[in-house]
Each structure stands twice: as C-alpha cells, then as structure tokens.
From Swiss-Prot:
Protein's organism: Bradyrhizobium diazoefficiens (strain JCM 10833 / BCRC 13528 / IAM 13628 / NBRC 14792 / USDA 110)
Gene Ontology CC entries for this record: cytosol; membrane
Keyword Transmembrane helix: no
Function recorded in the entry: Aminoacyl carrier protein. Can be charged with L-glycine via the formation of a thioester bond between the amino acid and the 4'-phosphopantetheinyl prosthetic group, catalyzed by the bll6282 ligase.
Keyword Zinc-finger (UniProt): no
GO-annotated biological processes: lipid A biosynthetic process
Processing after translation: 4'-phosphopantetheine is transferred from CoA to a specific serine of the apo-form of this carrier protein.
Residue ranges constituting the Carrier domain according to the UniProt record: 6-84
Name of the protein described by the UniProt record: Aminoacyl carrier protein 2
C-alpha cells in the first residue's frame, strides 16, 4: 500500500475511533468494519463526516456524501484519496 494511502487510512481510523468513543461505543474497528454494524447512528455518521472534513481540510461535494462512502474506513479512505487526488475541496 502506498504511504499516502496508509496515512489516510490511519487518520480515518483515528477519527472513527474518536467518534465511537464520543458516542460511548466500544468496538474493535478495522478498515473493512461496517460502521453501522458496530453501532454508529445516523447522527454519528454526520459527526464523522464533519470530523473527516476537518481532519483532511476538505469540503466534501454533496455527491460524495453517501452511505456507501461512509460504510467503512476503507470506503472513506477511497473517497478521501479521490478527493485529495482530484484537487477539489
């Protein structure tokens, strides 16, 4: 895996763990973990989206804010790498 992707994945994992902790959810999170399955609510997802934007200094385009893109750390990683690579945001 490329260093940038590893860095993005680690940062996303950190943000996800922070949101889970703030929502009193204790879970072992892996890149493929389905966040809804480990207990993240829709409000938690909104919080996660905002924290991801802040962490990566991005404004996600509306079309990227989908359940599929926030399904797992891996899905968010792909979306973020795409945004960083496209120079948008």
């Amino acid at each position: 895996m490329h260093n940038t992707a590893i860095n993005v994945q680690n940062r996303v994992l950190s943000v996800v763990r922070s949101v889970l902790q703030q929502n009193a959810i204790s879970a072992d999170v892996h890149p493929e973990s389905r966040l809804v399955d480990i207990g993240l609510s829709s409000m938690g997802m909104v919080e996660l989206m905002l924290k991801v934007e802040a962490e990566f200094d991005l404004i996600l385009p509306q079309f990227e804010i989908t359940p599929e893109n926030f399904r797992s750390v891996k899905a968010m990683e792909r979306m973020i790498l795409n945004q960083l690579g496209s120079g948008s945001g």
